[in-house]
Amino acid sequence: MENNRFKSDEQSFLRLSQQREQNQRLKALFDNAVGEEEISLRDENVKHFNLGANRHQAVVYSEPVHFRNSEGDAWQEIDNTLEETVTAQGRQVLRNRANRMHVEFPQQMDGGNMASITENGRTFAWRFEQEAQPVQAVARTGAQLKQERLVARAQTMPKFVGRTVESLRSADLAAEIETAQEQRGDVAQLKAENTYESVLPGVSVRYTVMSNRVKEDIILANAEALSRTVIRLPKAFDYEVTDAAQLLVKDVQSGETVFMMDTPLVYDAAGKETLAAVELTDMGEYVRMEYRIDPLFMNDAVYPVTIDPVIHSTNAVHNIQDTTLGEGQSAKPYTADHLKIGKYSGTLRCVGLLQFETLAIPPAGNTIIGAVLRMHTMSGSTSNVVAAYEVLKPWESANVNWLNFDPDDTSNVSD
């Protein structure tokens, strides 16, 4: 008697296998399709690409990639490339090319403000209390920063064994390493960097402009240098330090918070972290801001030590919330620019939390054929495998930690 069920199962399996192979071929095809951006579909955090053959891709970013000056304007690409220019007052500065948030740095330290952010007609500027040395700015573009990241990635790949660092730096690594999908989704000009070496004894400063934020890295060569990091804030604003050590910059007339400095993260060369406290003193002509860091941390630290506050306006939009939970820890390192996953320093178990606030919703009738979360390793990884689990309860990055949101609790995170 013929086993029709067996034949039917065999045919179904064959069709499934063929479909899987076809899907893999199509995936490879569209991964390497150059694609053309559909500019009319832009949103603040989203780009759309037409890949041909009636296939489209939406790339959702964690922060704005587009800006517009008013509601009715078309979305423009943010370009934070730093360009040399001269202000109306004759000061030679570096200014970002295209953004609703305007950032300026002196081409050479000149006793004036080290940095300024202008948005919605208001400008917030600051500098060290001590006069900085006349150090020249060293600016790098987003493309240069991306190439540096690709060089580090290439050095871990077998195909580049035997290549010198110099040859990697001069190579078109994006073409050699990334798919067309990765290349079209990477908006390099979103980021730029500017560094002043040794502006004060033992103190260097590095600024990274990222979308609609400025990250300030104050780099200490030794413990004594901390005393030189006192910041001079203008009396044009009122200030408040929150319980979470955030600095609120307020309009004097309305009391509205118009700029904000996130809780300053502090880390040493070995990756050990803590948070800095912020202390304000009214000096009459200006407001004095000091960073207070645990003396035990400073004594045990492997130098250099970096203090890295992030400054932005209150209009800054972030499309994701993320943070790291350290087992048994109360810390809330949500201002860090990375997640820790796995064992930190070989002992502390860490879990990352990540959620998108807004996703790209396709038109009715469209079929979603794939979704990818793109992340990259910063350091310390011994494995490329990361497990993802559904989070079952709401959380806020500024408030969540292991003690109030245990990820081992299956009512918080699925198992």
Language model segments and positions:
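Beta-strand-rich interaction/scaffold domains
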Residues: 377-415
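Flexible, small-residue-rich N-terminal segments that precede or flank a structured functional core
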Residues: 306-361, 396, 410-412
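Acidic glycine-/aspartate-rich tracts in secreted/extracellular proteins
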Residues: 225, 234-238, 359-362, 378-382, ...
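A short beta-strand element within beta-rich, extracytoplasmic domains
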Residues: 229-235, 356, 366-380
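Residues that cap or anchor secondary-structure elements
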Residues: 2-314, 346-347
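Cysteine-clustered segments with highest specificity for TGF-beta superfamily mature ligands
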Residues: 276, 282-292, 337, 403-415
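Extended extracellular/luminal ectodomain segments enriched in beta-structured repeat modules
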Residues: 223-228, 348-351, 361-372
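Signal that preferentially marks extracellular ectodomain short beta-strand elements
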Residues: 295-299, 357-362
